[in-house]
Amino acid sequence: MGKEATRVRRRERKNIASGIAHVNSSFNNTTITITDAQGNTIAWSSAGTMGFKGSRKSTPYAAQVAAEDVSKKAQEHGMRTLEVEVAGPGSGRESALRALQAAGFTVTSIRDVTTIPHNGCRPRKRRRV
């Protein structure tokens, strides 16, 4: 059995002017995905992929670094304007949004799309510290 040739997928440069930034900020991590208007992923990053481990992933600074990384990737595809959809209760929401604006994007709208249960699943027990 011979060695199989490893195929390298080249990322084709799309030329998309506007898109949607999905910022999902949980208690443990912050993920940012930039998609086009149809929802196809163009670039993504998270605090974990930026090298933060453990409790440092949930910090606002980690979210800011992830937002700077994803904005650099999206600007390579020619993106200039963004709609931002923020979800989750985490601490990285505002800092990720500020980092996207500081990267040079024109933010046209900011929506909070956090899901709220109509008394669905039983929540976790209260922490007693």
UniProtKB/Swiss-Prot annotation:
One of its GO terms (molecular function) is rRNA binding. Disulfide bonds: none annotated. GO terms for cellular component: ribonucleoprotein complex; ribosome. InterPro entries: Ribosomal_uS11 (IPR001971), Ribosomal_uS11_bac-type (IPR019981), Ribosomal_uS11_sf (IPR036967). Keywords: Ribonucleoprotein, Ribosomal protein, RNA-binding, rRNA-binding. GO terms for biological process: translation. SUPFAM superfamilies: Translational machinery components. It comes from the Bacteria. Located on the platform of the 30S subunit, it bridges several disparate RNA helices of the 16S rRNA. Forms part of the Shine-Dalgarno cleft in the 70S ribosome. Part of the 30S ribosomal subunit. Interacts with proteins S7 and S18. Binds to IF-3. Belongs to the universal ribosomal protein uS11 family. This is Small ribosomal subunit protein uS11.
